[in-house]
Amino acid sequence: MLLASLSDLLPGGERLLAEAVAALGLPGVSVRVSEQMVQGIRTRRVEVLEEAPQPLRHLKDLTDIVAAAPEKHWPADVKEQGLAALTRLAEAESTVHGEPLEHIHFHEVGAVDTVVDTLGAVLLARATGASRVVASPVNLGSGFVTFSHGRFPVPAPASAELARGMLTFAADSGMELATPTGLAVLKTLADGYGPLPQGSILALGYGSGTYSTGAYPTFLRAYLIECGPRRARPNADDASTEDACAEADDAGPTRGRGNLFGPHGHSHSWPNAHMSSGRTFTKDEEQGGHSHGPHGTHGHEHD
């Protein structure tokens, strides 16, 4: 939902994402962007499509794919951050399973989805223009999750490992609200944690997935916010004294001098994050659920 909300927030985000995914050179892989109603609210959904099952891929395979991607579509800093998130994901699995990093492979069902979710979110976050990302506390959820290694209490082992150093909490949701992939991306993008920044909302993006609880809206909302002046200024037209902030309710980052703000005290899986660079991008987690399938489809398995 982070990817979907960012593509909705950013003008031209849908086209930017589609062209970038095509440039990855993965045979038969594309994205489909559509709109769907979630409890009466229009949201955007992004699906990763594969014409044929992709082979199991280790981290080195993914590194090679990203390295070969043309910088016209995948700037060097996007590649660097994307690979950092994928590496975090693999390292978490390596730690919890006690396996060497080179033995960790991305699940055959979720490998391509994970790559597109991760790199796409970083790309769109960069395109928004924010230079700093701040996240609100991450709701990890509660209850149990079942994947290839059995049934585990939430957060699953890899999620708990990834949550180290992040500001988290657990609401009585009875379900997993923060996936390993989502945590890896957020941890890579966020520079710190804090409340929703003060400012004027310029744009909103709503992202949803396939899961719905029926109890509360399952979407992630992203905001683009123009922050107030840093200091008193005699001339209201003097833009040099103000910041632009972007916030996202469970969404992603922004571009420029902004903040990316994630969930803030809500019952969803993503924390609020805002990037500062004149603009702030924020994302809210006031909705529950996430767009991935069972834990095994968005994490890794070991050989």
Predicted regions located by residue number:
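Non-catalytic, charge-rich alpha-helical accessory subdomains
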Residues: 95-106, 115
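Conserved phosphate/anionic-ligand binding catalytic regions in large, soluble enzymes, centered on
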Residues: 1-7, 106-129
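Residues at or immediately flanking beta-strands
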Residues: 30, 103-105, 132-134
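Glycine-rich nucleotide/cofactor/substrate-binding loop typically near the N-terminus or early
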Residues: 8-97, 156-159, 164-169, 173-183, ...
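Mobile "lid/hinge" segments at catalytic clefts and subdomain interfaces of large enzymes
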Residues: 16, 130-237
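Divalent metal-coordination and catalytic microenvironments
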Residues: 46, 113, 186
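Short, glycine/charge-rich beta-strand/loop segments that flank catalytic centers
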Residues: 83-84, 102-110
